[in-house]
């Protein structure tokens, strides 16, 4: 298997002293699997796409945040009007006496520890910081170099305060409409999602919520739910021995034949063929071995 493309620091940071850079992806195009000489924070503002991080697929959209380590490998596929910012940084170039280890990964051994959601309020606070950070990181004087690190610290604190796990939005004190619906959808991977009941419970207008969701993500609510269910199915096909019919049920598909048809249409291969890609072939002995 060919090694992933390596993105080098010198192609993104103006000098060997500059610790931070911002690359605006307006829009983010399909990008092959790659790794880096630096770390990055990815914040999605609009649209949607498939983000494959360390072989784990995520259907990403407005408000998704990823902390990417240098050794991680990831790619972007099936993008639709995907708008995001990459905040690139080199940990070894950070000199402020800050508790970076509590603000930036590694945060723990969990596979999805680098994936978070950002509240609507958090997005509003983060955006002007990123804009200023982008301006300062294009300069090479010593004051700008120091200011970029200060701005990165400010951004890291804002993200720490306003990030949450997708399935825990209901714990937020002031849940915004988009945060609430995202949480509910994440908790409905294997069960029926009752839109009318959700809106009644949270005192929301169904039509307005659907319009807001499509405006921010570029998808309907039902399409997004189907996409995250398919991403969950891919994870189960790769990492479990469950029967395909059981996986279909775990991902909200009552009919396994319908699941196979939808999966094949979206992935370009059947669930069985997809699973076969990740089954290692046994090593056969050579002729000289007993």
From Swiss-Prot:
Keywords (A to Z) from UniProt: Activator, Cytoplasm, DNA-binding, Repeat, Rhamnose metabolism, Transcription, Transcription regulation
Primary subcellular site in the record, as a coarse category: cytoplasm
SMART domains the UniProt entry points to: HTH_ARAC
Keyword Methyltransferase in annotation: no
Start-end of DNA-binding region: 196-217, 244-267
All copies of domain HTH araC/xylS-type, residue ranges: 179-277
Described purpose of this protein according to its UniProt entry: Activates expression of the rhaSR operon in response to L-rhamnose.
Protein name: HTH-type transcriptional activator RhaR
Organism: Yersinia pseudotuberculosis serotype O:3 (strain YPIII)
């Amino acid at each position: 298997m060919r090694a992933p493309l390596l993105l080098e620091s010198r192609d993104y940071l103006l000098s060997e002293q500059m610790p931070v850079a911002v690359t605006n992806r307006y829009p983010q195009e399909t990008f092959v699997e790659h790794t880096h000489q630096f770390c990055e924070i990815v914040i999605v503002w609009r649209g949607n796409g498939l983000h494959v991080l360390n072989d784990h697929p995520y259907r990403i959209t407005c408000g998704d945040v990823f902390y990417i380590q240098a050794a991680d490998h990831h790619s972007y596929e099936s993008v639709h009007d995907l708008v995001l910012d990459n905040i690139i940084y080199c940990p070894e170039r950070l000199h402020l006496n800050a508790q970076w280890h509590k603000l930036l990964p590694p945060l723990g051994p969990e596979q999805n520890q680098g994936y978070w959601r950002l509240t609507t309020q958090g997005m509003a606070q983060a955006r002007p910081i990123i804009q200023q950070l982008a301006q300062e990181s294009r300069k090479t004087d010593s004051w700008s170099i120091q200011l970029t690190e200060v701005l990165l610290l400010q951004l890291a604190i804002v993200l720490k305060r306003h990030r949450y796990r997708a399935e825990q939005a209901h714990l937020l004190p002031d849940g915004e409409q988009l945060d609430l619906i995202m949480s509910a959808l994440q908790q409905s991977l294997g069960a029926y999602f009752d839109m009318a009941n959700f809106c009644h419970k949270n005192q929301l207008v169904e039509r307005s919520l659907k319009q807001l969701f499509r405006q921010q993500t570029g998808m309907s609510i039902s399409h997004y739910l189907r996409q995250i269910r398919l991403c969950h199915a891919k994870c189960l096909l790769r990492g479990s021995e469950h029967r395909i019919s059981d996986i279909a049920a775990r991902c909200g598909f009552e009919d396994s034949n319908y699941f196979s048809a939808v999966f094949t249409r979206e992935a370009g291969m059947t669930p069985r063929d997809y699973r076969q890609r990740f089954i290692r072939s046994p090593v056969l002995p050579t002729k000289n071995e007993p």
